[in-house]
């Protein structure tokens, strides 16, 4: 009997957080960005805040993140409890984006989408062996699938939370909406 063994799987957990008031949260994020100088890490244009893990208006989101990490870890099976290591917001105007990057040695990383206008861009995850997969298959596949795709696009959608391994390279496409900003909150988690 023949069978395929799926090895070295890369899980991406997603859930909709229905109990977050995104309209209010978006306003709080915009207000906060007017007082905080921010930083440049992977963002090309736009605003990226400094660490927000102790900012009061995010406390309910932090609680939801903790629950989601605990749920995701049932499959990951890491020892210990999830500890939020860092949290920051991203506000992306027209053509602003995030270059390919990863979150290093963090056990899990994630993003929560607060505001996502039409044409705001997707999040793109690269295969861990991106260069080899791209070279090996060199667009010779009939259809992209989990075995042959060098990258995978997932939608940026308000209320959606993604969790993924911190080592996974990813980027965010440019926001092509000329009038409304894309707002997301990203974070890193380790287990202890």
Task: List PLM regions with ranges.
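A structural signal for short, well-ordered beta-strand segments
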Residues: 87-89, 110-112, 185-189
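Short helix-to-loop capping/linker segments positioned immediately adjacent to catalytic or ligand/cofactor-binding
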Residues: 75-78, 96-100, 111-112, 170-174
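UBC/E2-like fold recognition across ubiquitin and ubiquitin-like conjugation systems
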Residues: 12-14, 23, 30-38, 55-58, ...
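Catalytic core of Fe(II)/2-oxoglutarate
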Residues: 144-192
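A short coil-to-beta-strand element that immediately follows conserved catalytic motifs
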Residues: 77-87
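Non-heme Fe(II)/2-oxoglutarate
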Residues: 1-79, 97
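Catalytic core of non-heme Fe(II) oxygenases with the double-stranded beta-helix
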Residues: 93-163
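A generic structural micro-feature
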Residues: 7, 81, 102-106, 177-181
């Amino acid at each position: 009997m023949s069978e395929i063994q799926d090895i070295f799987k890369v899980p991406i957990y997603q859930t909709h957080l229905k109990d977050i008031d995104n309209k209010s949260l978006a306003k709080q994020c915009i207000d906060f960005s007017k007082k905080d100088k921010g930083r440049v890490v992977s963002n090309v244009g736009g605003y990226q805040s400094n660490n927000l893990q102790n900012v009061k208006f995010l406390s309910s989101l932090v609680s939801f993140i903790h629950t989601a990490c605990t749920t995701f870890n049932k499959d990951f099976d890491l020892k210990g409890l999830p500890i939020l290591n860092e949290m920051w917001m991203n506000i992306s105007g027209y053509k602003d984006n995030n270059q390919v990057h990863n979150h290093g040695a963090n056990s899990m990383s994630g993003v929560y989408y607060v505001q996502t206008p039409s044409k705001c861009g997707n999040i793109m995850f690269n295969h861990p062996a991106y260069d080899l997969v791209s070279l090996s298959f060199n667009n010779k596949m009939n259809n992209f699938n989990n075995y042959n795709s060098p990258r995978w696009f997932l939608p940026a959608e308000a209320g959606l939370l993604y969790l993924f391994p911190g080592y996974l390279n990813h980027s965010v496409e440019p926001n092509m909406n000329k009038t409304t900003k894309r707002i997301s909150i990203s974070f890193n988690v380790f287990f202890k």
